[in-house]
């Protein structure tokens, strides 16, 4: 076999069209230019070989490409970090918002799976609340196109990313080549994820009201949260963006092991540019015993939320947590199809520490 044949045999596969389209959009953002709807349509048509009217691409493809473009732009933009002062961060995110067209049209997949990309500003805030340290392992159970994960990479953490949508998994593998990427039903992440994966941090924005097994169900987000919590290593921290109707007291009562709620913030209109005016909750939970009451607030003031996040208690035994969070030493990279197995029967759980939740 010739050298050229050998080289050809080991060529990297071509990136999916959504990734190449996203890269062009990211380069526009990096050049300081705004992206209009017509710009997105033109770029998508160029890279998908035709227009959406001809069936070459769909609204969901365009949304994924635009979201991935922001992720790629943020990866390359060193001036914004998790430690960036609030005034600089606010200015940056306002500028970015002005250069991105809103998602006023929702795709069938978004509606079906309740998939809304986390806005960059809220993603930055949630990741800042994690108190990340280099080399620890972070799990994101419903990673989407990577808007939360990008901040974890900037902090130097290792990533275990799970996403059930094949399109969004393509985005993740394009943007996070060093990450372990799987395709499980995140409602069963504790049962389906490799047992050797023990994250010290979980960062998540789960679907709120649609599950694979049950269809539309207002407690879907709670089951995603519980499964991720059960996989979190002792002493770890979980930061979640949940729906306003999430029953915090019920979760705390049934949580396995020690649990301390650090923050319960109702965030108003955070997803407006993503097609919904829903109020969400930013929750911070530590897997430790504590008698302290959480900070509880309802606001749409970004600076106020940052102040609360910066005042969070330090994570327990950070060095020990970094040492115990693990990935399999030589785990192969693979995409795992979503499971259709029945949900496991509820298990007997240890009653959590009693915590008073402030009324919101």
Q: Locations of the language-model features?
A:
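Short, conserved SAM-binding/catalytic segment
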Residues: 170-180
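Conserved beta-strand segments of alpha/beta enzyme cores
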Residues: 158, 179-182, 259-262
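Class I S-adenosyl-L-methionine
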Residues: 4-172
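Conserved Class I SAM-dependent methyltransferase catalytic core
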Residues: 126, 162, 166, 215-285
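Short hydrophobic short-linear motifs embedded
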Residues: 6-8, 327, 333, 357
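Flexible, glycine-/basic-rich loop-and-beta segments that form/coincide
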Residues: 272-335
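Long, low-complexity, intrinsically disordered segments
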Residues: 349-360
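Conserved proline-anchored active-site loop of SAM-dependent methyltransferases
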Residues: 123-133, 137-154, 161-165, 184-217, ...
């Amino acid at each position: 076999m010739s050298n050229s044949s050998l080289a050809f045999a080991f060529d990297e596969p071509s990136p999916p069209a959504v990734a190449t389209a996203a890269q062009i959009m990211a380069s526009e953002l990096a050049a300081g230019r705004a992206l209009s709807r017509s710009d997105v349509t033109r770029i998508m048509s160029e890279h998908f070989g035709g227009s959406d009217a001809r069936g070459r691409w769909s609204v969901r493809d365009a949304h994924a490409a635009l979201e991935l473009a922001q992720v790629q732009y943020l990866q390359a933009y060193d001036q914004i970090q998790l430690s960036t002062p609030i005034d600089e961060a606010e200015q940056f995110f306002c500028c970015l918002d002005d250069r991105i067209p809103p998602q006023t049209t929702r795709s069938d997949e978004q509606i079906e799976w309740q998939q809304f990309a986390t806005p960059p500003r809220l993603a930055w805030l949630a990741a800042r609340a994690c108190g990340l340290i280099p080399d620890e392992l972070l799990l994101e159970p419903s990673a989407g196109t990577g808007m939360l994960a990008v901040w974890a990479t900037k902090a130097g953490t290792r990533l275990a990313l799970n996403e059930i949508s094949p399109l969004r998994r393509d985005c993740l593998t394009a943007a996070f080549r060093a990450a372990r990427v799987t395709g499980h039903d995140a409602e069963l992440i504790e049962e389906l994820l490799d047992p050797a994966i023990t994250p010290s941090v979980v960062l998540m924005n789960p679907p709120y009201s649609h599950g694979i097994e049950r269809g539309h169900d207002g407690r879907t987000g709670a089951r995603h949260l519980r499964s991720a919590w059960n996989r979190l290593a002792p002493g770890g921290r979980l930061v979640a963006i949940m729906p306003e109707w999430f029953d915090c007291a019920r979760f705390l009562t049934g949580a396995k092991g020690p649990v301390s709620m650090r923050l319960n913030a109702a965030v108003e209109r955070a997803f407006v540019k993503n097609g919904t005016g829903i109020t969400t909750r930013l929750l911070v939970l530590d897997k430790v015993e504590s008698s302290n009451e959480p900070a509880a607030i309802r606001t749409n003031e970004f600076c106020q939320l940052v102040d609360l996040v910066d005042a969070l208690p330090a994570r327990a035994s950070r060095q020990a947590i970094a040492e115990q969070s693990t990935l399999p030493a030589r785990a192969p990279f693979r995409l795992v199809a979503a499971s259709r197995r029945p949900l496991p029967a509820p298990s007997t759980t240890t009653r959590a520490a009693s915590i008073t939740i402030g009324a919101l």
